[in-house]
Each structure stands twice: as C-alpha cells, then as structure tokens.
C-alpha cells in the first residue's frame, strides 16, 4: 500500500463561519491541520482587534480535546481602518494579517474597501510593523466579465500596490489564472499566493458542462483548463511562493442549491487528501510537503510544524453531506470517492 508521510500541514486561507456552525467547521479543519488563517468576513465582520480576538476565543472553545490546532486571526480592512488599529492588532500576538475585500467582491464583503487610497495609511503601518496583507484579487466593476476580474485586478490594482509598498508582504489569495501565476512568479520575494484544491482539480467545464453543478461555484470562479494547468504547474514546481490555502467556504445546502446560490466550495472534510490527488495527477507527490507544510510558515516567518501526518493511498466514500450547525453542507466530491486518506 502506498503511504506518504509529511510534516503536519497548515491551511493559509479558510472560512470557519460562526455561531452554531463553528463546532462543525473547527472539527473538520482541526483533524490534521496545525494552524489556519481564518477569514474575517463574518456578519458583522472582524474590523477591529477586540472583535477578532473574541472570534479567536470562540474558535478555540470548539477545538476538540487532544488537538493542538491554532487559529491565526485576520483583520478585515475597511475604508476607516486606522494605522493605530493595525499596530494594536499586531501587538495582540494573535492577529497576523489584514485582508482586502474589494466592496461587493465576495460573500459578506459589503463592508469592504471602496477606494484603495483609503487604506494606504493602514498599508503603511502594516509595512512598518510586519503585518501581512491578504488580497481577494478581483475587481468588482460590473462591466468586467467575471472570468476576467482577477486578471484586471492584477493589471490595474495589485501591480500598483506592489510598486507603492515594496516592503509589504502580500498574499494574493486563491489564485485562479495563469496571469496570477506569472505575476507572482515574477514579483519580488514579498509576494506569494495560495492555491485551493478545487482550483487544482477542476475547471469551469466541471461546473457548467452537462448541467450546472452549484457546489463548484466559488469566487474567484473556476476558469478554463489552461489556467487550471498553470495552477498545477505552479503548485508542483517547488517554487516557495505558492502554498496551501483551501478557501473552504461552507454554505447550507439550501443556500447553494438555489435560484441564486451562494459562492463557496467546502473542502475542509478532505483537504490534504484532495491536494494529494492533484499532486499525484502531475507525478509530483514529492513536492506536496513543501507546498502544504513549509512554504506557508516560511513566508509568514513562523516555525514549521514539528510533527507529521501519514497519507495512505486508499479510496473512501465521501458522505453526501456533513452537519453544519442546524443545517447540512454538501462537500466537494459528495457521494463519490477520494483516493487518499489520512491514517
């Protein structure tokens, strides 16, 4: 039987939600992830240090006994985020980054930034204190085609931020295009990117050909297969700028299977298992450990995990749904099989 032992991985981008859903999302992510960057787009969002730290406490209260899982918190940037708030967040020791959501770009982003110039003072402070800048890299102009919004963001916005703040560490999150791969590859060592398992395994044909499959609908949206291949190439290249970020984003079944369904795919039930499939598909299992366990903490200037997990090449049946608070969530690969499992 094929086995693969790797240093315990981390998830550098996840949505854990809040309230009754928290016990279920934390249960899934804490099975074998050491740490996770927890997104702050709650209702209301975590726009200040106190709110983010209270959320940290709620997450920790749900970590199962015996798990060493540690949430890493993120501040939600708004037009009014002050340099003082950035310094306060950094001094907390629990908040490691601040997140740009262009207003209206994704789930619960209505409180986001309307004009980048409004956050330049905050970015200056982040550059000074060494706080990372996480970016949802899509424009929100309705005249821009949804499949082009990442590319246009990089060309018109991100390139300027990188030039204006050369010492600011920036993570372009959940990249979906060859354009993003090329930009990150060519940028300075202060620019990195996360890649999801579902963007490595799927493209827009999986979502749209032969019927609409709403559980593949996420933002940024799945792109054509040429972009998928570029992502696989980047992830499997060994380039230290690319690392694991699931963007696992649960929504109740009835909110996905609807006339106007929510964006987000749930992969926390089998994150590293799905990444193993993706890396195996390009004969690069030997590159999985760096992508999943080394590149992220190295970029964040955090220690790598010291223990290991073991993956076994053994198929298992994915349930059609998992509990999610008072509802259920339909995961990626629901009712089908995954080729790998964690021992």
Curated annotation (Swiss-Prot):
Transmembrane segments: none annotated. One of its GO terms (molecular function) is dihydroorotase activity. It holds the Pfam family Amidohydro_1. Gene3D superfamilies: Metal-dependent hydrolases. The active site is at residue 247. Belongs to the metallo-dependent hydrolases superfamily. DHOase family. Class II DHOase subfamily. CDD domains: DHOase. This is Dihydroorotase. Catalyzes the reversible cyclization of carbamoyl aspartate to dihydroorotate.
């Amino acid at each position: 039987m094929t086995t693969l032992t790797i240093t315990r991985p981390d998830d550098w981008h996840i949505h854990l939600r809040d309230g009754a859903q928290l016990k279920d999302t934390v249960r899934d992510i804490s099975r074998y992830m050491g740490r996770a960057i927890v997104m702050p787009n709650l209702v209301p969002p975590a726009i200040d240090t106190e709110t983010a730290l209270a959320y940290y406490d709620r997450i920790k209260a749900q970590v199962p006994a015996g798990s060493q899982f540690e949430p890493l918190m993120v501040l939600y940037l708004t037009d009014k985020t002050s340099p003082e708030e950035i310094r306060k967040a950094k001094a907390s020791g629990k908040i490691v980054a601040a997140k740009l959501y262009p207003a209206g770009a994704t789930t619960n982003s209505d409180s986001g930034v309307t004009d980048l110039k409004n956050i330049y003072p905050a970015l200056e402070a982040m550059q000074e204190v060494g706080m990372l800048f996480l970016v949802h890299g899509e424009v929100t102009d309705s005249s821009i085609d949804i499949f082009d919004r990442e590319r246009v963001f990089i060309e018109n916005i991100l390139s300027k931020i990188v030039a204006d703040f050369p010492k600011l560490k920036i993570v372009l999150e959940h990249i979906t295009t060859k354009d993003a791969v090329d930009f990150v590859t060519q940028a300075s060592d202060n620019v990195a990117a996360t890649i999801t398992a579902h963007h490595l395994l799927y493209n827009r044909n999986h979502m749209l050909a032969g019927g609409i499959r709403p559980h593949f609908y996420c933002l940024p949206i799945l792109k054509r297969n040429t972009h998928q291949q570029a992502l696989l190439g980047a992830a499997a290249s060994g380039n230290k700028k690319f690392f694991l970020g699931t963007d696992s984003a649960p929504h109740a079944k009835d909110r996905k299977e609807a006339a106007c369904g929510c964006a987000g795919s749930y992969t926390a039930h089998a994150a590293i298992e799905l990444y193993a499939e993706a890396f195996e598909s390009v004969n690069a299992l030997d590159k999985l450990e760096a992508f999943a366990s080394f590149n992220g903490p190295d970029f964040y200037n955090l220690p790598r995990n010291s223990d290991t997990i073991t993956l076994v090449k053994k198929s298992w049946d994915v349930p059609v749904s998992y509990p999610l608070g008072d509802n259920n969530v339909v995961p990626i690969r629901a009712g089908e099989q995954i080729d790998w499992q964690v021992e």
